[in-house]
Structure formats: structure tokens, C-alpha cells
Design a protein with these regions (language model features):
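Active-site-adjacent structural elements that line small-molecule/cofactor binding pockets in enzymes
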Residues: 1-312
Length: 312
């Protein structure tokens, strides 16, 4: 089983030197990957409820370093750890330029890129970026995935879709990873499972939050559906990775009897949770270890590695 960490980059109080230190410590402790979130802008008025909070309000401040720029910066400061977009909103960017940036980063990092892709949820962000229509974001994402793979694998790339078209071009360099950069599909909806089964190299949902607990039994149920989609597409579902992003845990938080959430509590409790998800079919766990101060965040990362992961 592999383990990853979410990059604590959503605050102006975290300096570039802090992010380098975080990444290097994660690498030294043996973590598999670091995830980087994706928002280009945050509208002041948001009409669509945020799916991961009880009140539907987006909890962010609007501070977001650009995803691929951040990954490039940190890849240059590390040697082995992988970097995962978690998740990049596929319709926000021109697919050919995005494929080029990802391929270039894969070459420069010597094959350490994973692309987590989602369809997005913030309608006003689509509108302000002049992205394809919000209502068509699922179809756009499907098409962009196919376009990415065509550009990354074909010697003479050609694509004729509704949202993306190119032909008679040279696209070099190709990614270091073969046959292509892995694409993990974010989300937990039926369409996300269909997309992962048909097109993804991995399924990358969020779990352990009040609105979407995604208990191990839920994972088993969803994986059965994903497997059906994979078989229908002529694919082997065993080749599709399952990478769950867990909620922020807190080893000091007092949980009332019967009220405990997954990944919260003692090292023993969190270790037990991870084993439950491993048995359900999860092979990669990603955690957010942010605390009030950056020093505490680094301490929490080390605690996670030595007191939890070491016991798995």
C-alpha cells in the first residue's frame, strides 16, 4: 500500500521554502506522492453547493498557487516523490497546451507525474474562465482524456472531437512514463465510476467527510460498479488503481462515543481504518496533515509516518 500527502499551499503564510521543506521531508519519510489542488480563480458569489461540507459553503479563502507551476517548482527540489494533481479540472485549460505542460513536466521530473482529473463543480469559475459550458463538463473531460492519450502516445497525433481537434502536427517530447502519464479519475458519482472504468488508470475519490463518508462497504459497492464498466470497455479492472483521499485527522480531538469519524483519533484507530480500506480494495491513501502552524504540520507528517504507516 502506498501513502501520499496533500500539499499545504492554500495560505499566503506558507512560503516557498516551507513547501520545499514539506516535500523533501515527505520524500525522506518514504511517502509515495504529494497532491496539489486546482482552482484558477474563486468567484465571490458561488451558486452551486460545495459537495464536501454540511452547509454547502466552500471553505477556502481563494488563495491557490497554480497547480502545474507548483508541481514543476517542487519536482525540481526533489528526486523521487511523485506529484499528483488532485484534482485538475479538465475543462479549464486548453487540452493541447495542458498535455504539453504535463508531458514536459514528466520529462523534466523523470516520470514523476500523475494526473488526477475531475469535471469541476464551481459553475461561476467555468463562466469566468470562458471554459466550455458547465453542463457539458463531463463530455468535455471524456474527450480531453482521449486527446491527452493521443498526444502522448501517437507518433502522428490526430483527433477530431466536438471540443478538441488537431491533425498533421508534431507533439514532442512524449512523456517518460509508458505508455503514458497515469490518469486518475476524481469523484464518486456514477459518471465518475464509469469514467474511471472506461478511461482511467485510477479512481481517486474523497472519503471520510460528513457529506460523503465513503465507508469501506461503500468502496466495495462502488468498485463492483467500476468493474462492470471496465469489463464492458474490454479492460481489466485489476489494472485500475484505487487512491482514496482521507479527511483531515486529528490525534488529539476528543470524539464522543458513537460519533467517531474515520481517520480521527489515536494511531491505533487510524491504522485500523487504513486496514479496513485496504481490505475493501484501496491501494493508495492520501492524507491532509495541515495544522495551525507549519512546524506542527511537519511534526504531524512525521507522526503519521512513524506511528501509523509503519504499523500497516
Amino acid at each position: 500500500m502506498e501513502f501520499g500527502l496533500h500539499l499545504p499551499a492554500s495560505s499566503s503564510s506558507v512560503a516557498s521554502e516551507d513547501l520545499i521543506r514539506f516535500s523533501r521531508q515527505a520524500e525522506a519519510l518514504g511517502f509515495y506522492c504529494i497532491t496539489v489542488a486546482d482552482h484558477v480563480i474563486v468567484p465571490r458569489n458561488i451558486s452551486v453547493p460545495y459537495p464536501y461540507t454540511v452547509d454547502g459553503k466552500y471553505p477556502g479563502t481563494g488563495y491557490h498557487l497554480e497547480t502545474l507551476t507548483t508541481m514543476s517548482f517542487l519536482a525540481g527540489a526533489t528526486q523521487r516523490i511523485r506529484f499528483l494533481t488532485s484534482v485538475m479540472i479538465a475543462p479549464y485549460r486548453n487540452p493541447v497546451i495542458t498535455a504539453k505542460m504535463l508531458a514536459s513536466l514528466d520529462v523534466l521530473s523523470q516520470g514523476r507525474v500523475i494526473v488526477g482529473l475531475g469535471v469541476g463543480w464551481m459553475k461561476e469559475e467555468f463562466e469566468n474562465l470562458k471554459a466550455p459550458a458547465y453542463q457539458e463538463r463531463g463530455r468535455v473531460t471524456d474527450e480531453y482524456i482521449k486527446a491527452f492519450r493521443e498526444l502522448w502516445t501517437s507518433e502522428k497525433p490526430s483527433f477530431n472531437g466536438k471540443y478538441c481537434t488537431f491533425s498533421n502536427i508534431i507533439f514532442l517530447p512524449k512523456p517518460v512514463q509508458k505508455p503514458a502519464i497515469p490518469i486518475w479519475i476524481g469523484g464518486h458519482s456514477k459518471q465518475a465510476l464509469r469514467r474511471a472504468g472506461e478511461l482511467g488508470d485510477g479512481w481517486h475519490p474523497i472519503g471520510g467527510v460528513p457529506t460523503i463518508p465513503l465507508e469501506p462497504d461503500d468502496v466495495r459497492k462502488d468498485l463492483r460498479m467500476l468493474e462492470e464498466y471496465a469489463h464492458a470497455a474490454g479492460r481489466d479492472p485489476r489494472e485500475i488503481r484505487v487512491a482514496l483521499k482521507g479527511s483531515l485527522f486529528d490525534r488529539e480531538k476528543q470524539i464522543s462515543p458513537g460519533q467517531r469519524r474515520r481517520f480521527m483519533g489515536s494511531a491505533e484507530e487510524i491504522t485500523s481504518d487504513i486496514r479496513d480500506y485496504r481490505e475493501a480494495g484501496v491501494d493508495t491513501m492520501i492524507f491532509d496533515v495541515r495544522r495551525a502552524s507549519f512546524t506542527e504540520t511537519l511534526e504531524r507528517m512525521e507522526w503519521m509516518a512513524k506511528e501509523v504507516i509503519a504499523k500497516i
